[in-house]
């Protein structure tokens, strides 16, 4: 028997900011959509992804 949550906020949002979260820290703010990563995590992992780091 599976329990399905009910109420106004029980379904996933298919559009808008609530539908996209960072794959690293799961925040909804500052998302780079092609990477599905927030700007803070991007700065941390840019070198690992393959971007050149300039000082």
Swiss-Prot record:
Gene3D superfamilies reported for this sequence: 30s Ribosomal Protein S14, Chain N (4.10.830.10)
Binding site for Zn(2+): 22, 25, 38, 41
Gene Ontology biological process terms from the UniProt entry: cytoplasmic translation
GO-annotated molecular function: structural constituent of ribosome; zinc ion binding
Signal peptide (from-to): none
Keyword Transcription regulation (UniProt): no
PROSITE patterns: RIBOSOMAL_S14
Pfam family, one: Ribosomal_S14
Keywords: Metal-binding, Ribonucleoprotein, Ribosomal protein, Zinc
Cofactor note: Binds 1 zinc ion per subunit.
Annotated segments matching region Disordered: 1-20
Co-factor requirement: Zn(2+)
GO cellular component terms given for this protein: cytosolic small ribosomal subunit
InterPro entries linked to this entry: Ribosomal_uS14, Ribosomal_uS14_CS, RIbosomal_uS14_euk_arc, Ribosomal_uS14_sf
Coiled coil spans: none
PANTHER family noted in UniProt: 40S RIBOSOMAL PROTEIN S29
Family: Belongs to the universal ribosomal protein uS14 family.
Protein's UniProt name: Small ribosomal subunit protein uS14
Taxonomic source organism: Encephalitozoon cuniculi (strain GB-M1) (Microsporidian parasite)
Lineage: Eukaryota, Fungi, Fungi incertae sedis, Microsporidia, Unikaryonidae
């Amino acid at each position: 028997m599976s329990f399905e949550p009910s109420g106004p906020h029980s379904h996933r949002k298919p559009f808008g900011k609530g539908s996209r979260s960072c794959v690293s820290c799961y925040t909804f703010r500052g998302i780079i959509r092609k990477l599905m990563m927030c700007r803070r995590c991007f700065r941390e992992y840019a070198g690992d992804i393959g971007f050149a780091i300039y000082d």
